[in-house]
Amino acid sequence: MQRNGLIGDTIRSLGFLSRLPLPQGWFDNTDDSLPRNARAFPLAGGILGLLAGVALLIANAISLPPLAAALIAIGALAAMTGALHEDGLGDTADGFFGASTPDRRLDIMKDSRIGTFAALTLVIWTSVKASLLMAIIARAGAGYALLALIGTEAASRAGMLAFWHALPSARPGGLADSMGQPQWETVVCGCGLGLALLAIGFLPSGGMVALINALVLMTVVLFGFARLCMAKIGGQTGDTLGAAQQIGSLAALIGLVMAL
């Protein structure tokens, strides 16, 4: 069993990013750290997107309305990941907009309770993502929505990887800080994989325009979010990494829908 290749990295990335049952043998007797395995984050994301897309296809095949199919896909993603990234998005919203100092913002982000800003953000985010998936189903078909989920979930985790590399840790001793940061080579590999899967997911329905739209929007919004993180807390935390993934996924879907 080749534990240290890309397949092993993908399985270990799935182990970190999801709650899927995975063979324990892939996690034993390996010295690989998460920042190195992170090159496979986009592949893990693509697998999660594929599974969510299958749920969407099944819902569509039994004649559920597009809204129900879209919400089932979103729910499947949250169930598979334990709402890991959604939790980060909510905590980030509470911390950034519920306090006036960096230390207080970080304290709020560690609090497991959900606040007003988190609740509003998650409701709005879910509504917008569902409407975008509905638009893809209506304009292109459920099969293309499946491909879009593969591309979106892969590319957004590549964006998260670049975000993680680019920003310093805002909370010494926190989860993100204790894991270290991915090296440049890891980021390049991960972004290449994310771009490949984004192309596979978007080109069949939206063509090159969709791909360019998604890349431009993801770059702009993640750069803006990085600037916001530096201004609010002086860097990144595990919560902001999750938020970056969520923001990137929404930006990519918007780029596709604009091209349909």
From Swiss-Prot:
It comes from the Bacteria. It is found in: Cell inner membrane. Pathway: Cofactor biosynthesis; adenosylcobalamin biosynthesis; adenosylcobalamin from cob(II)yrinate a,c-diamide: step 7/7. InterPro entries: CobS. Keywords: Cell inner membrane, Cell membrane, Cobalamin biosynthesis, Magnesium, Membrane, Transferase, Transmembrane, Transmembrane helix. It is a multi-pass membrane protein. The chain crosses the membrane at residues 42-62, 64-84, 117-137, 144-164, 192-212, 214-234, 240-260. One of its GO terms (biological process) is cobalamin biosynthetic process. It catalyses: alpha-ribazole + adenosylcob(III)inamide-GDP = adenosylcob(III)alamin + GMP + H(+); alpha-ribazole 5'-phosphate + adenosylcob(III)inamide-GDP = adenosylcob(III)alamin 5'-phosphate + GMP + H(+). One of its GO terms (molecular function) is cobalamin 5'-phosphate synthase activity. GO terms for cellular component: plasma membrane. Its EC number is 2.7.8.26. Disulfide bonds: none annotated. Its cofactor is Mg(2+). Belongs to the CobS family. PANTHER family: ADENOSYLCOBINAMIDE-GDP RIBAZOLETRANSFERASE. Joins adenosylcobinamide-GDP and alpha-ribazole to generate adenosylcobalamin (Ado-cobalamin). Also synthesizes adenosylcobalamin 5'-phosphate from adenosylcobinamide-GDP and alpha-ribazole 5'-phosphate. This is Adenosylcobinamide-GDP ribazoletransferase. The lineage of its organism: Bacteria, Pseudomonadati, Pseudomonadota, Alphaproteobacteria, Hyphomicrobiales. The gene is cobS.
